[in-house]
């Protein structure tokens, strides 16, 4: 019910426009720093990140007229969120092309083969997955009673997708850099 109410919004209809009260929280259309009145209303123990953001722009750079002796680490606004794994994978595929795609497919096939071999050998995979920290509801939904060995292996293979994607994201640039250094690949073309 709460999900339906969130979809409908406060006006009770889908797509109702709501004017936000704190436009400075949106980031893209408003400055990153909250207005001075909002800073005065915050509790006395202010977060250092909030103070750095209020003193400078949203990337941690300060106005030279307001510079202090301390240097803060780079702070980003909420508008600059980290990309998801799938977005990072698409970027790798666009940048490295067939090398990225073929390496990811190779890693996926090896992973599926290993999980098929483990499941067909009779290892109790649900117990291992629970020890690794997967939720019991997730494990039970992926492993219904009476499913074939391949289906169970494929379900476990899908559970480990973030690991495979991370391996691809780390290894593709390293492999391409090595092959370019050896001379197997041409250096990248200069962008106009």
Curated annotation (Swiss-Prot):
Annotated ranges, domain DUF1279: 80-191
Residues that span the membrane, as ranges: 99-119, 150-170
InterPro entries assigned to the protein according to its UniProt record, in alphabetical order: FAM210A/B-like, FAM210A/B-like_dom
Protein name: Protein FAM210B, mitochondrial
Region named Disordered: 57-80
Alphabetically ordered keywords of this record: Differentiation, Erythrocyte maturation, Membrane, Mitochondrion, Mitochondrion outer membrane, Transit peptide, Transmembrane, Transmembrane helix, Tumor suppressor
GO BP, one annotated term: cellular response to estradiol stimulus
Transit peptide start-stop: 1-58
Induction behaviour: Up-regulated by the erythroid transcription factor GATA1.
Expression (tissue specificity): Expressed in late erythroblast differentiation stages. Underexpressed in ovarian cancer epithelia cells compared with normal human ovarian surface epithelia.
Role noted for this protein: Plays a role in erythroid differentiation. Involved in cell proliferation and tumor cell growth suppression. Involved in the metabolic reprogramming of cancer cells in a PDK4-dependent manner.
Keyword Membrane: yes
Compositional bias segments (type: Polar residues): 63-77
Domain of life: Eukaryota
GO cellular component, one term: mitochondrial outer membrane
Topology in the lipid bilayer: Multi-pass membrane protein
Family to which the UniProt record says this protein belongs: Belongs to the FAM210 family.
